[in-house]
Structures are given as C-alpha cells and as structure tokens.
Amino acid sequence: MPQHSRYSDEHVEQLLSELANVLEKNKTPTDLSLMVLGNMVTNLINTSVAPAQRQAIAKSFAQALQSSVSNDQAH
C-alpha cells in the first residue's frame, strides 16, 4: 500500500532542489555531501525528537534509506 504524506510533492521537491543546489554550487563531492547530510539528520533527531524516541526514529530512517537505494549498477 502506498504511503501518504502530510506534505505535498511540490513542497518536498522544492526543498530537495534547494538542498541539491547548495551542494552543487559548492561543488561538494559525494562523500562530503553524505557526511553533511548525515550530520544534519543526526542533529535533527538529537534536537527535535524526544530522547526516548531517538533510536526508533533513527532505525526507521535507516531502514527507509536502505529500502529507497537502487541496486542498479549504473551511477
């Protein structure tokens, strides 16, 4: 069953585009981009999620990330 979001596709795409533009503008290599985005996720969890829920949120995020990564050999 498809998941429904409380956020519009347009809003999500706008934010994604803005974040990608910042990384592209700074010619950020992939490893640094992943490091910065990972640190951002960690900071969001640590500052915006109740301590009792942090591990569950992090696990859910990691599982969603793994599920969304393509096994396609092209890059």
From Swiss-Prot:
Pfam families linked to this entry: DUF1414
InterPro entries with a match to the protein in the record: UPF0352, YejL_sf
NCBIfam families, per database record: PRK13689.1 (NF010242)
Family: Belongs to the UPF0352 family.
Protein name in the entry: UPF0352 protein Ent638_2783
